């Protein structure tokens, strides 16, 4: 029963991380753009 109460309180505890979770899926796109910019900087060797 205590585990159920703990799980019920978890969403409230993680509410501050909601903006972070919204940004997380975009991070791989940033890596892709970074790789493209890096290749452009070295002249597409």
Curated annotation (Swiss-Prot):
Compartment annotation: Cellular thylakoid membrane
PANTHER family according to UniProt: PHOTOSYSTEM II REACTION CENTER PROTEIN K, PTHR35325
Organism listed in the record: Nostoc sp. (strain PCC 7120 / SAG 25.82 / UTEX 2576)
Transmembrane segments: 24-44
Propeptide residue intervals: 1-8
Pfam family, one: PsbK
Any one GO CC term of the record: plasma membrane-derived thylakoid membrane
Domain of life: Bacteria
Keyword Thylakoid tagged: yes
Membrane topology, as annotated: Single-pass membrane protein
InterPro entries for the chain: PSII_PsbK (IPR003687), PSII_PsbK_sf (IPR037270)
Function noted in UniProt: One of the components of the core complex of photosystem II (PSII). PSII is a light-driven water:plastoquinone oxidoreductase that uses light energy to abstract electrons from H(2)O, generating O(2) and a proton gradient subsequently used for ATP formation. It consists of a core antenna complex that captures photons, and an electron transfer chain that converts photonic excitation into a charge separation.
Protein name (database record): Photosystem II reaction center protein K
Major location (coarse): membrane
Keyword Thylakoid carried by entry: yes
Family (UniProt): Belongs to the PsbK family.
Keywords: Membrane, Photosynthesis, Photosystem II, Reaction center, Thylakoid, Transmembrane, Transmembrane helix
Any one biological process term the GO annotation gives: photosynthesis
Subunit description: PSII is composed of 1 copy each of membrane proteins PsbA, PsbB, PsbC, PsbD, PsbE, PsbF, PsbH, PsbI, PsbJ, PsbK, PsbL, PsbM, PsbT, PsbX, PsbY, PsbZ, Psb30/Ycf12, peripheral proteins PsbO, CyanoQ (PsbQ), PsbU, PsbV and a large number of cofactors. It forms dimeric complexes.
């Amino acid at each position: 029963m205590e585990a159920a109460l703990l799980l019920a309180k978890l969403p409230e505890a993680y509410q501050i991380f909601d903006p972070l979770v919204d940004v997380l899926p975009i991070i791989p796109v940033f890596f892709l753009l970074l790789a493209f910019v890096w290749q452009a900087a070295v002249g597409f060797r």
